[in-house]
Amino acid sequence: MSSNNNFDNNKNNNNNNNSNQNNNNIDNGGNNNETNPTTWKFKAQTPTDFNITVRKRRNSEPGVLVQRSYKNYVTHWKLETKKPTKYKDAKEERLRQQAQQQQQAQQQAQQQQQQAQQQQQQQQQQQQQQQQQQQAQQQAQQQQNQHQQNQHQQNQHQQHQQNQNQNQNQNQNQNQNQNQNQNQNQNQNQNQNQNQNQSQNQHLHQLNQHHPIQHQHHSNNHSNNHSNNHPNQQQNHQQNHQQNQYSQQNYQQQNQGQNNYNNNSFQGNSNNNYNNGYNNNSNNSNNNNNNNNNNNNNNNNNNNNNNNNNNKNSISPTSSPLLFPSPSSAFTSIKSTPPKSISGSSSPFQDQARSPSSSFFHDRDLPFSRGGAQRKPSIGDEFKFHPYSLNNKVTNLIDNCNNSNNNNNNNCTESNDDDSPLNGGLGYSRLSQRRISLPILANRPPSPERSLSPIHERNSLNIINGFNKNNNNNNNNNNNNNNSNNNNNNNGNNNPLPHINFENRRPSREEPIVIINNNNDNNYNKIPSQHMHDKKSSPTPRSILKQTISKYHGNECEEEEEYNTNSNYYGDNDNRNISNQNLVASNASQSSGSKLPSIQSLLNDVSISDNKSKSNSNSPTIIGMNNNFVGGANENISKLSSITMNHHSNFNNLVDDNSHISNNNYNNHHNNNNNNNNNTNNNNHNNNINNNNNNNNNSNNNSNNNNNNSNNNNNNNNNSSNNNNNNNNNNNNNSNNNNNNNNDNNNRSPRNMLFYLNK
């Protein structure tokens, strides 16, 4: 009790109103819906001993947590029902008002509907009344008409009777007159009677002659009517038939004119579309001089129009002419209809020309596609790949050799050509259809199963072969093959434009870059068919994904390959012919001193020849999923001691700027990039050769078309060892403009990642 007295003294001294309020609440257990505190563990003797703290619950359940304490002793927490809100009545009134308003609105709507129905009924009644009135009027008019007709008939009958009476009276009068005349004639002399008899006989004879003349006249009229009607009808029928024939001829002529106009306009539009899409290939489609240095003025005009009128093609990023097809891979989801040939001409481009109403950007989205009827590629085809199946898309690459309509069979690469891997090329023959590409690491988890999947494995060489997959008459100026420009083979042959389906698509972010070694030695006499799938799981992050590739070379132990996704390396893929250099990262060279392998060691476990001394000169060539990685021609990847490297200008313009360009302004920005390339081409060729659709060979003609320079690659070796990409060709200062602007470290984020393989 002493403690209670102390508490009461404190309350009296401090005038604690809160305790009084709590008092009232507890005394009046029914007030404000509070529960009676008789069920608590600690029962107070006086109700003023309690302090109440109220907390809201976290969830939206009803009630609050109430903490009641006796002095400083916390009894327990208890869930009590939530007190009614002060504005509950107001809310109820609002709800009532809203309900009343809704009811009133419903009633008004019902009343309006009823009124509308009543109005409709009234209108229907009025219409019925009007119809009844009209029917009554019609009946009255009919009655009047009948009455008038009856009166008219009666009048006619009366007139007819009157006429008959008059005729009878006249007949009676005539009879009387005749009787009088007869009496007078009888009173004449007998001599006169004789004369009358003679005159009567003559009169009868004249009557007999007069009636046959009338009959003949009637028959003549009838025959004239028949003879006049039927020939006229026949003539009219013939004239009508001739008019119908004339109208049919006019219709046929109009149809022929329209068909000719449609055909001409169709071909014209398709050619214009082709010129817009394919730039330098259109006007020389029937010649073998597509890749001459001095292009025709028509060709240049088309290219100028393409660069100056890109708004025609810049409808949307997806409908632009293959400059920016999709951020995803073009091998999976692009659907296109096969082209239909317009005419039977020998032009290879009309096989791929399409109507203006259809989409202009058709099969060039797919690097595998060719001209001619072909079924639509589906996503399932990606998983049906087999390297030796006849249904493979690689067989399309060989069709040029077997095509009877192919006028230039120099594209048919055999194993003894300059392109074959036996002779040091990149391998465009049938032996090198087994191919490999490194994995796509962008936007993927670092699982080692994705490293060397066969789905992506077939993409790199298809793109390489796509460069050889040219049309019929559009192949080479000379008799050499497309990619025969090796390190020692700059014999003045111009590298032609790549295939239309192949060059105009920009690479997506997910497409890998494969490092391939160009080896000019005839060391690779055998490509075994063993498939490589040795996998090695590693907990390393995605930036450095280590995997093992089993080497086919003897008893060498397995070594790791390092995928450096943070690198800034960009390479050139112009002639597939970059001179011999080693691109070795500094950490890789310091740690293991390893060397980059050749492409033959990666392609299906290809055995490396015994001449290991030449493996040091194996130059890496960066081959992406698209030929648009092509930079300045014959520009070398320099030896670097760090993981930074200067951009090549064309690679910058064609690839890297896509990550900085919005979709809407893509074409305009891309035209500016192409104009940078065109300055070099204008200086080289004195022509306005413009690249609308990333024609990489136009930017590569800076060094490819230098027919007078036979030491291009040697100069590249000297310059690339000094980290100078300026002097690409000693005799071609104009082509160096592509690289002068790129010695700065423009370290933009690359679209695709280089994968460095440590041999």
Swiss-Prot record:
Low complexity bias: where? 1-36, 142-211, 221-347, 463-495, 660-747
Q: Report residue spans for region: Disordered.
A: 1-47, 142-380, 409-428, 463-504, 654-759
The positions making up the signal sequence are none
Q: Which domain of life is it from?
A: Eukaryota
- Biased-composition ranges, Polar residues, are 348-360
Question: What is the protein's name according to its record?
Answer: Putative uncharacterized protein DDB_G0279653
Organism classification, top ranks? Eukaryota, Amoebozoa, Evosea, Eumycetozoa, Dictyostelia
